[in-house]
A protein has these predicted regions:
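Beta-alpha junction/loop-to-helix N-cap segments that form part of ligand/metal-binding clefts
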Residues: 47, 84, 99-178, 184-185, ...
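Bacterial N-terminal signal peptides
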Residues: 18-30
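C-terminal region of N-terminal signal peptides and the immediate post-cleavage residues
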Residues: 27-47
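Solvent-exposed, acidic/polar segments of extracytosolic/periplasmic ligand-binding ectodomains
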Residues: 43-48, 52, 324, 412-479
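N-terminal extracellular/periplasmic Venus flytrap/periplasmic-binding protein-like
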Residues: 40-130
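Short, charged, surface-exposed loops that flank catalytic or proteolytic processing sites
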Residues: 368, 372-375, 396-409
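Extracytoplasmic ligand/sensor domains, especially the bilobed periplasmic-binding protein
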Residues: 137-244, 298-327, 331
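Extracellular/periplasmic periplasmic-binding protein-like sensory domains
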Residues: 185, 290-384, 470-476
């Protein structure tokens, strides 16, 4: 749906990950901070048998949306017309399920709830209302990854309510939320392991290279470093130089100063390859410091904190030299285009194509500001489509006796589900994140136009930037 030439092919909507809010909330709400040494997840066989939110004819399901009147909501709508289509998308795909007979005779009752992502107290109150108040709620679905961090744990760990969520971090988070928290986004633990493996095989790590890690001081990033990345590097005999940057969103001056010092240290040490573990509010100052000091090491980007996605939006300005040509690991279908052409030609994968077919039939007209009615390959419409159909699959498998235990047991049996952001989703009794594969992509500035970026409609100009697939799908390492 986006205008070709103004964005990269297959671009997804981006938003910051509130690492600082995640950690603050975990402490304030009495939850354990994430730790790689967390206790084993609660088995699905020990889930609650409560059927709260389920009646003889309906299933109450919450769909949280960032308020369109909030600052972030207004920004998203201005930058992406499809973002404003979310309510239509939710009703369309819920109606598709209900009109086909529902789930074992029950209809999904969609409860679409707007929230301000900057209002922590409001989010906490909403969570408690859903999990303890009226009307009762059976499940929460988040197709875009906006109900993030500790909010996931409020619903699942505290509220014992099933949640399907696109926002993800490392394995310890689903351990805390088990057996109710199920991610459609990739677990970052195997993503980091894949980053190290690819780094070694591509010559970016090892082979005499000096390696650095730039990480924020936020507890979630420190845990990713110490519990996951450092052990992965140790296995291949790499001892990196680690530099830390302030990562809280309200520490702008400290972040800028730390970024400058971090680059000075890495440059002075002759570091050639850098693995960033940074939220975007620290990632961009770090790139600015690289640029101002004319220091451009190889960056090993990844889905961690959405760095590989964010990077595409930062070229050709302001960080062309720092990012153009950099590569990274992703479990998402980056590198395709927003067209219902064959997948082999860069078009929709089967899951997204099925979503587009339903959307196109209902809304064949071209939305204002777009050139066609094609949905974004990584956009809001397919995100909600994926989450709703995955929920319906598990709820149907749970049978007539739908309760929390039968639902999560059904989720643990789902394999090879056609995904949206990722091609395939597979789960298990102790596998709470669906993606199973990763690819390596390059951030590419397409000025002047080249054949590296897949073309959209022939009548439209080529994309200005794109992800170029450098290595296609391989299995993610076991987490």
């Amino acid at each position: 749906m986006r205008m070709w030439g103004t964005a990269g092919t297959g671009a997804r909507r981006l938003r910051s990950v509130g690492a600082g809010v995640v950690v603050w909330g975990a402490v304030a709400f009495g939850l354990a901070s994430p730790s790689g040494a967390s206790s084993a997840p609660t088995p699905v066989t020990q889930a609650s048998t409560s059927s709260r939110g389920v009646s003889a004819t309906t299933i109450n399901v919450v769909f949280p949306l960032i308020s369109f009147t909030s600052i972030e909501g207004q920004f998203e709508i201005e930058s992406d017309a499809e973002y404003g289509e979310q309510t239509k998308a939710i009703h369309l795909f819920v109606d598709q399920i209900n009109d086909a007979g529902g789930i074992n005779g029950r209809k999904i009752n969609p409860m679409i709830v707007s929230f301000d992502p900057t209002n922590v107290d409001e989010q906490r109150a909403l969570c408690k209302q859903w999990t303890q108040g009226n009307p009762p709620v059976f499940a929460v679905l988040d197709g875009l990854g906006t109900w993030e961090g500790v909010n996931e744990l409020c619903v699942t760990r505290e509220g014992h309510t099933p949640m399907l969520a696109q926002w993800s971090t490392t394995t310890n988070w689903t351990d805390l939320g088990a057996p109710y928290l199920w991610w459609t986004g990739a677990d970052d633990a195997p993503i980091l392991a894949a980053t190290v493996s690819w780094g070694v095989s591509s010559g970016r790590l090892g082979h005499g290279k000096k390696v650095g890690v730039v990480v924020s001081d936020q507890a979630s990033d420190q845990d990713a470093l110490n519990s996951y990345l450092m052990p992965d590097l140790k296995k291949v005999g790499i001892v990196p130089q680690v530099v830390t940057i302030a990562g809280a969103v309200d520490e702008t001056a400290a972040t800028d100063s730390d970024a400058t010092l971090a680059v000075e240290r890495l440059k002075a040490a002759g570091v050639q390859s850098v693995i960033p573990l940074l939220p975007d509010n620290a990632f961009t100052p770090y790139l600015g410091a690289e640029t101002s000091q004319d220091y451009f090491p190889k960056l090993l980007l990844s889905d961690y904190q959405s760095e590989i996605e964010i990077a595409l939006g930062l070229i050709p300005v302001p960080y062309e030299k720092a990012l153009n040509g950099q590569q990274g690991v992703t479990a998402e279908t980056l590198g395709g285009i927003d067209l219902p052409r064959p997948e082999s030609q860069g078009g929709y994968d089967p899951g997204v194509r099925s979503c587009w077919t339903v959307w196109h039939k209902a809304y064949p007209q071209t939305p204002k500001g777009n050139i066609n009615d094609d949905i974004e390959e990584q956009g809001p419409v397919q995100g909600w489509c994926q989450e709703i159909h995955l929920f319906a699959k598990a709820a149907t498998m749970a049978g007539k006796d739908l309760n929390r235990r039968t639902f999560v047991e059904a989720m643990s049996r789902i394999t090879d589900f056609p995904g949206g952001y990722s091609p395939v989703l597979s789960y298990g009794p102790d596998k709470f994140s669906g993606p199973t594969q990763y690819r390596v992509v390059e951030v590419h500035d397409n000025h002047p136009p080249t054949s590296l970026c897949k073309r959209g409609p022939a009548t439209q100009p080529p994309a200005g930037v794109c992800w170029v697939v450098e290595q296609n799908w391989k299995p993610l390492p076991s987490s």
